[in-house]
């Protein structure tokens, strides 16, 4: 039985609306909300191992941008899988972000940013607040409301952290990938070794078409695992 499944089964008797996972597998306790999508996401990452795909240069993975970090489960997984990497975890929702900080508190290689990955710098808001927090969608908002969400670009992150090459860009941003990939994506895709994304055509029709059009500008080895499309830059073809 996989370690993730053993841990997941041990959760099932937890109470009080929270699952608290304590295991030597993790650097600190992991908190999941019982009524949100957290247990399902935990199962995807640690039981189904949907982010396990055998990066060809694992020891050389230096920078991971985790867009749509939710409560930090992917960041925790990436920290174990790529111990030499710095991970930038971006999450727009305040409640998710608080748990992201808590769940990664002992992971010194993880930096948490309360923002949304977007194609340009502007203020955003959640357009579907009736949904569970893992399914929030972003929309531009022309307002000075202090509760609005900061939209941040890939280029801004690269400049802020002096990143010259992104080892992995993980994107799970509930439809915002459509705007991201249809607006000059080549400028930063040229600096990505690996893109891992979940597409949401049922939220924004045409998302897949936009994504594959942008990706076609470069040579990728592409395959699917679970809900994710994994694209590895085909460096061997150009060496």
Predicted regions and their residues:
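Phosphate/nucleotide-binding beta-alpha loop and adjacent structural elements of enzyme active sites
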Residues: 1-239
């Amino acid at each position: 039985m996989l370690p993730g499944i053993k841990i997941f089964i041990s959760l099932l008797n937890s109470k009080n609306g929270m699952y608290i996972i304590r295991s030597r597998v993790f650097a600190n306790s992991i908190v999941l909300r019982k009524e949100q999508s957290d247990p399902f996401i935990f199962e995807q990452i640690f039981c189904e191992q949907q982010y396990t795909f055998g990066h060809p240069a694992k020891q050389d993975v230096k920078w991971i941008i985790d867009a749509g970090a939710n409560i930090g489960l992917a960041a925790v997984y990436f920290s174990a899988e790529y111990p030499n990497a710095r991970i930038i975890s971006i999450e727009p929702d305040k409640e998710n972000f608080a748990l992201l900080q808590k769940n990664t508190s002992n992971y010194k290689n993880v930096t948490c940013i309360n923002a949304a990955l977007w194609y340009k710098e502007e203020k955003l808001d959640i357009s579907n607040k009736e949904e569970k927090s893992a399914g929030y969608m972003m929309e531009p908002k022309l307002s000075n409301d202090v509760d609005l969400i900061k939209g941040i670009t890939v280029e801004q992150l690269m400049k802020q952290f002096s990143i010259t090459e992104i080892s992995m860009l993980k994107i799970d941003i509930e439809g915002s990938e459509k705007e991201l990939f249809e607006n000059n994506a080549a400028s930063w895709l040229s600096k990505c070794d690996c893109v891992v994304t979940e597409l949401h055509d049922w939220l924004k029709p045409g998302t897949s078409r936009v994504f594959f059009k942008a990706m076609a500008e470069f040579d990728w080895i592409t395959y699917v695992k679970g809900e994710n499309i994994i694209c590895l830059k085909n460096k061997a073809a150009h060496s």
